């Protein structure tokens, strides 16, 4: 079936002692509807919270956490820890494996299995110095993706509050880990005019990609850069490291019809291709777009005026239109919990704009 995009994937979900744990079953069923085989493992504190939840009986919930039965289930392709409590996050960071779920996690770390951790705790625990140490430790492992909680100002108390991000954000992260595109893409030609070291566009992408990496706005393989060219949109490939772009990482989007992206290139285009197409297709040749991830800008409350209402989904027509509307009055868009989009005539001007926005935020804006 067309929507079985996770077919053949085995996902372990480890849920901890947080109120959000009761929302896990619907999310697991959503993953299963896309073809994944999902197993749930709950910590002792989580088991207390979900003890009376009948919905947990209808999923692969490993109640007894029996290590002797470990071989009865398939080896995981990915582990999702959601929600992840203060206690569990710190135990992961320092290597404590005092329960079956934690043993599964540390075993997976040892064999370099992709792991996603979605933090869920109150603002005071999140600001605890132990969390900052744990985040520093976890960030050294490139196989672990850490999803920070969403932090907002309470409308009634005017105080900061934090909660786990939306399940849409978590699902999006899973898809990215498996390099699954949020849209259908069709390759028409494996080569394009930019797949050469001699290409001026490639040289510019390579040069400025390194610059974006150096100012720390395109971490790991996050972000993309694009440019309006004569016969379409040139964009970096999905999974490309912006700081280490090769000629094969340049993809040409020729057209988008019926939500299908038609492209030339050896690799698939960036997951932000629909956004890039809509923002650049009517622009003059040479106009550029950068999708970056500056954490300080992402979590600053000063940017609410140019921030999307909800977590930004790359294939959502309404949200792409929302981005277009924000850009009418602003020179950039803060995609909620999904980075930023800057448009400019030159990469130099975009870099200057990013640095200007960053410097305009005081240390008090740090979360």
Predicted features along the sequence, with ranges:
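A cross-family phosphate/adenosyl-ligand binding-site feature
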Residues: 1-173
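N-terminal entry module detector
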Residues: 143-144, 176-182
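Glycine-rich flexible loops
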Residues: 179-367
């Amino acid at each position: 079936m067309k929507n079985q995009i996770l077919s053949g994937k085995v996902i372990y979900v480890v849920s901890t002692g947080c109120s959000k744990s009761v929302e896990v079953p619907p999310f697991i069923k959503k993953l299963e509807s896309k073809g994944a085989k999902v197993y749930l493992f709950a910590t002792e504190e989580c088991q207390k919270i979900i003890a009376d939840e009948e919905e947990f009986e209808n999923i692969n919930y490993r109640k007894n956490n029996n290590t002797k039965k470990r071989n009865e289930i398939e080896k995981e392709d990915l582990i999702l820890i959601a929600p992840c409590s203060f206690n569990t996050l710190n135990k992961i960071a320092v290597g404590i494996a005092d329960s079956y779920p934690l043993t599964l996690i540390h075993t997976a770390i040892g064999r370099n299995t992709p792991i996603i951790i979605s933090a869920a705790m109150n603002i005071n625990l999140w600001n605890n110095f132990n969390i900052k140490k744990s985040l520093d430790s976890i960030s050294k492992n490139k196989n672990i993706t850490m999803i920070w909680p969403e932090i907002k100002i309470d409308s009634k108390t005017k105080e900061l509050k934090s909660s786990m991000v939306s399940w849409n954000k978590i699902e999006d992260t899973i898809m990215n880990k498996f390099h699954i595109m949020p849209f259908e893409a069709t390759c028409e030609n494996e080569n394009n005019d930019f797949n050469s070291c001699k290409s001026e566009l490639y040289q510019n992408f390579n040069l400025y990609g390194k610059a974006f990496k150096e100012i720390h706005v395109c971490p790991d393989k996050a972000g993309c850069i694009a440019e309006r060219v004569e016969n379409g949109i040139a964009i970096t490939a999905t999974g490309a490291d912006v700081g280490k772009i090769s000629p094969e990482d340049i993809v040409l989007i020729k057209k988008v019809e019926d939500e299908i992206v038609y492209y030339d290139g050896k690799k698939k285009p960036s997951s932000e291709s629909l956004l890039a197409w809509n923002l650049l297709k009517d622009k003059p040749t040479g106009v550029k777009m950068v999708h970056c991830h500056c954490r300080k800008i992402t979590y600053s409350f000063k940017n609410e005026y140019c921030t999307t209402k909800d977590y930004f989904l790359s294939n959502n027509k309404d949200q792409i239109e929302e981005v277009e509307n924000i850009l009418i009055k602003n020179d950039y868009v803060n995609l909620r919990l999904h980075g930023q989009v800057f448009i400019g005539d030159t990469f130099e001007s975009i870099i200057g704009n990013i640095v200007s926005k960053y410097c305009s935020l005081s240390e008090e804006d740090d979360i």
